[in-house]
Amino acid sequence: MHANWKTWAHVTKLDPDKRLPRGAVEEIATSGTDALMLSGTLNVTRENLQELLDLVSAYGLPLVVEPASPDCAIFDGGIDHLFVPSVLNTNDVRWIVGKHYAWLRQASGIDWEMVVPEAYIVLNPNSAVGRVTGADCSLSTGDVAAFAQVADRYFRFPIVYIEYSGTYGDPAIVQAASEAVENATLYYGGGIRSAEQAAEMGRYADTIVVGNAVYEEGIDVLRATVRAVQ
């Protein structure tokens, strides 16, 4: 039985390319967060992904891998789900379906019960994910709402993910996406570094994702963001 990701209010994102201080993994795992997502854009390899997975797998939290490339699409090591992103607001087809096609051409034994497609709307042009995918981040509130509705109602993505990646986003845009989505679960990630920001985005998103704060602000801030949405 795989973990029920639809019930999560708070997810902590850990980057395989970043180092955590000694003892930090246990503190993160006992912070109250609902799940751990192993994800990064740059310098993520199967080796450093596996190293991080080995560190976190002993704590019993639901584990998600969000692969940056087909090589990192793994199903073993105790993970519960593979969240596979498609970036909707790019003209580079590789990030919409190309890498997914390449993955399926080379893969075998895919456990489709573990695979959860994500419709990403990337909104920080200065972020690694924005640069790498060539995302058009100059979207209006109406543009984002339309993308969210296309993802939800037309393509039937189970997750719509508003990604500001490293910077705190516009709550009005997240609200518009929330109002446009009827069936999908709305994720928000980007720049949450306080309980107030977590609560603000948590009013509109079903699930907030906290990542950089773990490395830059510390465990007390992470715990505060958990309390704000649970």
From Swiss-Prot:
Function: Prenyltransferase that catalyzes the transfer of the geranylgeranyl moiety of geranylgeranyl diphosphate (GGPP) to the C3 hydroxyl of sn-glycerol-1-phosphate (G1P). This reaction is the first ether-bond-formation step in the biosynthesis of archaeal membrane lipids.
Compartment(s): Cytoplasm
GO molecular-function term, one example from the UniProt record: phosphoglycerol geranylgeranyltransferase activity
CDD domains recorded: PcrB_like
Keyword DNA-binding: no
Family: Belongs to the GGGP/HepGP synthase family. Group I subfamily.
Cofactor: Mg(2+)
Recorded metabolic or biological pathway in which this protein acts: Membrane lipid metabolism; glycerophospholipid metabolism
Superkingdom of the source species: Archaea
Keyword Nuclease (UniProt): no
Catalytic activity annotation: sn-glycerol 1-phosphate + (2E,6E,10E)-geranylgeranyl diphosphate = sn-3-O-(geranylgeranyl)glycerol 1-phosphate + diphosphate
InterPro entries in the record: GGGP/HepGP_synthase_I, GGGP/HepGP_synthase_sf, GGGP_HepGP_synthase, GGGP_synthase_archaea
Binding site for sn-glycerol 1-phosphate: K13, Y161, I162, E163, Y164, S165, G166, G191, G211, N212
Protein keywords: Cytoplasm, Lipid biosynthesis, Lipid metabolism, Magnesium, Metal-binding, Phospholipid biosynthesis, Phospholipid metabolism, Transferase
UniProt xrefs under NCBIfam families: GGGP-family, GGGPS_Afulg, PRK04169.1-3
List of residues binding Mg(2+): D15, T41
An annotated GO cellular component: cytoplasm
Enzyme class: transferase
GO BP terms in the entry: glycerophospholipid biosynthetic process
Naturally occurring in which organism (per UniProt): Methanoculleus marisnigri (strain ATCC 35101 / DSM 1498 / JR1)
Enzyme Commission (EC) number: 2.5.1.41
Name of the protein in question: Geranylgeranylglyceryl phosphate synthase
